[in-house]
Amino acid sequence: MTTATHPYDALMDITARPKAVFVRGAGSYLWDDSRKRYLDFVQGWAVNCLGHSPSAIADALAAQAKRLLTPSPAFYNEPSLKLAQALVANSAFDQVFFANSGAEANEGAIKLARKYGSLHKGGAFEIISFEGGFHGRTLATMSASGKKAFEPLFEPKVAGFKKAKLNDIASVEKLINDNTVAVMLEPIQGESGVWPATDQFLQELRALTKAHGLLLILDEIQTGMGRTGKLFHYEHTGIAPDIMTLGKGIGGGVPLAALLATERAACFEHGDQGGTFNGNPIMCAAGLAVLDEVGKPDFLKSVTETGLLLESELQKVSARHGLGGVRGRGLLLALDLKLPIAPGIVAQAFEAGVLLNAPQVDTLRFMPALNVTRAEIAEMIDCLDAILTKAGAARRVA
């Protein structure tokens, strides 16, 4: 299959894609090869936290590319040392391992927990994760995930994962046994439809894991780097995990992820973990640029304010069209449509030049750039409102 200028069939057909081919991006907008402009409220699934091709990242990449691409992970390099120090200084953790993707960071978290169990808990290896959770597409992270669609795939799965119910502390407690080493979850389950763990539940979970000597692992791949109005979501809750993973926004569009751990949990020994591009100077230069921007005065305050504005506007849409309300935090929000019409709305919005996401058939997810403007929010809301009005009229006629 081809467009006028681009063949498709050399790429593995792993997902349904619209036929547009994007060639340029700036801020909250993308342009395809026919010069059509799109307002992007997906941003690579919360990857482009500063929008498309921001000068801060582009300049950092260009400067680093002229200095050093990679010396091998067998040697230290300046950007990785600086980024690790900055992450430690701005978090509850003591050490960092850099990875190429969120799935790789989560795989590392699973390995680290098992290593901890081997050293300190008599070989305990089981990890309690959650129904509806999503931790990646490696075999182990798919096994840790609670995504129904994964269940029949690539059997046999990796053993050692038990699933509890989100926001149900009793369901966690009853799964704990002598083989349990950790509890792993996303503070907000993105792929299942933006379902937040309550602050109270996370506090109860922290108390429970401490009481049983278990590690608490937070997957902040989608919620981290300012997405919810704090640098890391756990800061909203008054607790701190033992292990945290980052991805998506930490690279601002460049493949970068991180595994962070407290001194107590950071028990890897030489040879336990590694990778050819881990801590690559180019990737870490992008991470430093992102952290510098997100750390500027009032940046996170602006994310909170903009998130409240987007939530308010979506609530108005929900009320006007008799929908199921809004959930989420900051600039990671979902609109409950109450009907399985989300894919159709996404398709119509695409034709109208607005990119939206449907993690479930009855849910729209919103993940704009953290510096999205009020005017851009208004533009998206106008488009969504028009589509829902048309859909409502069609249902009434039917």
UniProtKB/Swiss-Prot annotation:
Cofactor remark from the record: Binds 1 pyridoxal phosphate per subunit.
Cofactor(s) needed for function: pyridoxal 5'-phosphate
Protein's pathway: Amino-acid biosynthesis; L-arginine biosynthesis; N(2)-acetyl-L-ornithine from L-glutamate: step 4/4
Main subcellular localisation: cytoplasm
Keywords: Amino-acid biosynthesis, Aminotransferase, Arginine biosynthesis, Cytoplasm, Pyridoxal phosphate, Transferase
Stored SUPFAM superfamilies: PLP-dependent transferases
Protein name as annotated: Acetylornithine aminotransferase 2
Organism listed in the record: Bradyrhizobium diazoefficiens (strain JCM 10833 / BCRC 13528 / IAM 13628 / NBRC 14792 / USDA 110)
